Amino acid sequence: MSQSFIHFFTKLIFIRKIKSGIFHFNVFVKNIKTNIQVYFIKKLISQWLLNIKKDSPKVLIGANVLKPNGVDFHMHAIQELSQRDICLIPSDTILKKISFNDFFKNHIDKINPLSNSILHSHVYPNYINWCHEQKSKNPNIKWIHTYHAHYFPEYSEGDFLDWQKDFNKSFIEVASKADVKISVSKWQQIFYKEKFNIDTLYIPNGVDVVKCDKANAVFFYKTYGLRNFILNVSRHDPVKNPKEFVLLAQAMPEHHFVIIGNGLTKELFKEHYCISAPKNLSILGKMSQIEVQHAIAASICLVSNSKREGLPTLVLECMAQSKPVVVSNEPGSMEAIDHGKHGYFYELGDIEDLKRQTLLTIKDTIKPIKARQRVLEEYDWRVVIKKVDRLYDV
């Protein structure tokens, strides 16, 4: 065996040992970083739980999921605007560190509400069940539940999904045991009474008019180069029905259309909805609530194609900005526009009717002004929160 081969082989072994050492060192460093992160997360959660115990907030409201949807906007508005001491369960800070499921699996049972506490549940069975357990342990606790939207067949493509069945079961069998039950819409109040004999108080979903008034059409135009368009805010979800908006864009090539929504792409429309997005349709991604307000301000009208809504926040935001709106003839949207007094509606599935109503909508200068007044009187959070606070005080 030559000397050069021995030298080469020795060098190869040395290099492999170095690489192995580097690999194990990186794993060691990664584990240290992970352990440090876990330590600080545990410390953060412990401090948060300690603060709840020490401060004893009057109202524990949940379940917060920290997602840009109507239910989360609703709970955050209560926290921000209520004159009472409100604590979101879990807090935004906690949800930025651990998952929703992690919190309810490992931490929710560490919260021990006092006898004078008020538990206010919304939508999510994890929190509804926890509220029920706390109420069973301590009957002096006051439990309020808000019904936002029951799950109907329109929420799925075919049979109900298992989680939708679980949510509905929780609404009917568990949330119905709350001391006070609220419905965010009149149509839903009737539905729960007639279908399940559940009595609810009507306190409408609110809209943050102050935030709506901060909308800036110029900002949106400078950012995206778009203005004077017909707007839809949606997502890839059967109940949101984005396909009909694309069909409307196809039917009105002389107008520009914008659709905003997480996961919406030309490829998605082609592959899942079997439809081609026309050239006069701009597809934008997910946006924050204030960015959506800017989009509404830059638009000439909003079109909502939803198959089902509780009481749609988006439609109320559009009305708050005095922007024309056309909605599908589903109960929640119809209630928002007072069955045509403050907006236009079309027959779901009828694109020709949708086109007719959209053309009427963009010419109307009267209904949008009245629509804002309707929002200010009934749906402005500054009005709604007083009704919620009165329930907290009873």
For the regions a protein language model found, what residue spans apply to each?
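Short hydrophobic beta-strand element within catalytic cores of glycosyltransferases
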Residues: P324-V327
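Acidic anion/phosphate-binding donor-loop and adjacent secondary structure
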Residues: G206-K222
